[in-house]
Curated annotation (Swiss-Prot):
Signal peptide positions (record): none
Annotated keywords: Glycosyltransferase, Lipopolysaccharide biosynthesis, Transferase
Annotated PANTHER family: COLANIC ACID BIOSYNTHESIS GLYCOSYLTRANSFERASE WCAL-RELATED (PTHR12526:SF640), GLYCOSYLTRANSFERASE (PTHR12526)
Keyword flag Cell inner membrane: no
Protein name, as recorded: Putative colanic acid biosynthesis glycosyltransferase WcaL
Family: Belongs to the glycosyltransferase group 1 family. Glycosyltransferase 4 subfamily.
Length: 406
């Protein structure tokens, strides 16, 4: 089976779940191609980028300058030479194709692509990518079935939903399969009008063979805490920093590492300085997978206090939590989005309410005193949960079988 991944931007260091699924399909022996609208960050890449030669497998549709007017000029210049093609004219149908017609991105692509991209199935990651893929198929740029994976921001952000809800309803008709990553999102798609027969929950997972289950590590002095996340509001890292302020005031010895990059970096650093926590909180930025693994090995607890952003943006089910649970690192997170579908509070990890720094600090302080037997029981159940329900190899085999039926 030829599988093409349709992405708005590739590669992105924060979207390891996309990278992992691409390499999994390659490992299963499928012919894989990547079609992306824009080139992502090729400077900060994971080892798989080179190992699997993904640059050679990727076709970028646009190489645009920055800035709205510059983009529009670029697209107009690309559109004009292709006006002799019927698809280019068709792409200028504002009524049918909406903003992606008005901003000329569809016509620019149609003008430049002389031969369609052909695959048995196109897997579009995130709802907006599915919307664009369905339009490009109708315009003859893509040829194959389209399955769209819905993750989190694409089905929770108020800004995204205000723009894309009518587009999604078109996608429900044009597309072949909707793949929400959680039961919660499956319910939301149904409530938006997607026919139930076009919905199948397909979770993101982890490759269990990549993780050696470490021996039970009792919390040390200081307590070693770690977060690996894109630095955005919904990750709740500002709540974690506030909890750290309270822990320090209580005399709890700890060290906290926050790994990742993102738009909230300056805000988080300012908060650390404001609370005078520079001696206990470290933000080393982006680290490749092998360095992250070494830092995870040193950690006593993995912290991800996710929240609903002020714009409504929510998590799906964070892969970072799955990875920590798979390797045997205890996790502390929040009752948020699909996280309770992964972490059973008090049994395979610990959950506190969203935006509750006091509850988070209390949970971490209590964790620092946990006994070995209780910790071992939680860690064992956590790994079993991931192995049973979030095993990437099993999930991707099931997905491949499903895709062959559409």
């Amino acid at each position: 089976m030829k599988v093409s991944f349709f992405l708005l931007k590739f590669p992105l260091s924060s979207e390891t779940f996309v990278l992992n699924q691409i390499t999994a399909f390659i490992d299963m022996g499928h012919e894989v191609e990547i079609v992306a609208l824009q080139k992502g960050d090729t400077q900060h890449t994971h080892a798989a980028w080179e190992k699997y030669g993904l640059a050679a497998k990727t076709r970028w549709l646009q190489d645009e300058p920055q800035g709205r007017l510059a983009k529009l000029r670029y697209r107009a210049c690309k559109t004009l030479p292709g006006l002799h093609r019927a698809a280019t004219w068709k792409a200028l149908n504002f009524t049918r194709y909406g903003d992606e017609s008005r901003n000329l991105i569809l016509s620019a692509i149609c003008a430049q692509v002389s031969q369609p991209f052909v695959a048995d199935v196109f897997i579009a990651h995130f709802g907006p990518a599915g919307v664009t893929a369905a339009k490009l198929r109708e315009l003859g740029v893509l040829r194959g079935k389209i399955a769209t994976i819905f993750h989190g921001i694409d089905i929770s952000s108020r800004e995204v939903l205000s723009h894309y809800t009518p587009e999604y309803q078109q996608l429900f008709r044009r597309g072949d399969l909707m793949l929400p990553i959680s039961d919660l999102w499956a319910g939301r798609l149904k409530s938006m009008g997607c026919p139930p027969e076009k919905i199948a929950v397909s979770r993101m997972g982890v490759d269990m063979t990549r993780f050696t289950h470490r021996s039970v590590k009792a919390p040390g002095m200081p307590l070693e805490m770690i977060s690996v996340a894109r630095l955005t509001e919904k990750k709740g890292l500002h709540v974690a920093i506030e909890a750290c302020r309270q822990l320090k005031a209580q005399g709890v010895a700890f060290r906290y590492r926050i790994l990742g990059i993102g738009p909230w970096e300056r805000r988080l650093r300012t908060l650390i300085e404001q609370y005078q926590l520079e001696d206990v909180i470290e933000m080393p930025g982006f680290k490749p997978s092998h360095e992250v693994k070494a830092m995870l090995d040193d950690a006593d607890v993995f912290l991800l206090p996710s929240i609903t952003g002020t714009d409504g943006d929510m998590e799906g089910i964070p892969v970072a939590l799955m990875e920590a649970m798979a390797v045997g690192i205890p996790v502390v997170s929040t009752v948020h989005s699909g996280i309770p579908e992964l972490v059973e509070a008090g049994k395979s990890g610990w959950l506190v309410p969203e935006n509750d720094a006091q509850a988070l600090a209390a949970r971490l302080a209590e964790f620092s005193r946990i006994d070995h037997d209780t910790l071992e029981s939680v860690i064992t159940r956590a790994r079993e949960k991931v192995a049973q329900d979030f095993n990437q190899q099993a999930i991707n085999r099931q997905l491949a079988s499903l895709l062959q039926t559409i």
